[in-house]
UniProtKB/Swiss-Prot annotation:
A Pfam family of this chain: CcmE
Annotated protein name in UniProt: Cytochrome c-type biogenesis protein CcmE
Matching InterPro entries: CcmE, CcmE-like_sf, NA-bd_OB-fold
Organism this protein belongs to: Pseudomonas fluorescens (strain SBW25)
Membrane topology: Single-pass type II membrane protein
Residues that bind heme: 124, 128
Key words, A-Z: Cell inner membrane, Cell membrane, Cytochrome c-type biogenesis, Heme, Iron, Membrane, Metal-binding, Signal-anchor, Transmembrane, Transmembrane helix
Subcellular location: Cell inner membrane
Amino acid sequence: MNPLRRKRLLIILAILVGVGIAVGLALSALQQNINLFYTPTQIANGEAPIDTRIRAGGMVEKGSLKRSGDSLDVTFVVTDFNKAVTITYRGILPDLFREGQGIVALGKLNADGVVVADEVLAKHDEKYMPPEVTKALKDSGQSAPTPAKEG
């Protein structure tokens, strides 16, 4: 084989191997960072994977918020008005977190059907509702409740 042709072949092979490694690393990173959204109904029906990072969202049930007296542990129930799921969280809840309003929790579903959240996102004004929560409420035949005016 001609030395010039051999050199070109090695360069092309090196480029192909490099591109293959880059694509593999990119796909691996994307796979680890994908957090699929599940409604409380889907979680209760067993559609959400256990011990995999997910997003769970819905409306916080009134009267379900329980705070630990000696730690930052919080437990509350989220519903899509069909079924409900319990969420536990250790940390400070967002200022806009309220019972009766929409939230999205990021965490893992344990074997008991409880979402152990490491992040809780609250809706940030009266008009905004996460698209997934809006769709879940619409599918259940409910509409997002209008918050009471404060003041």
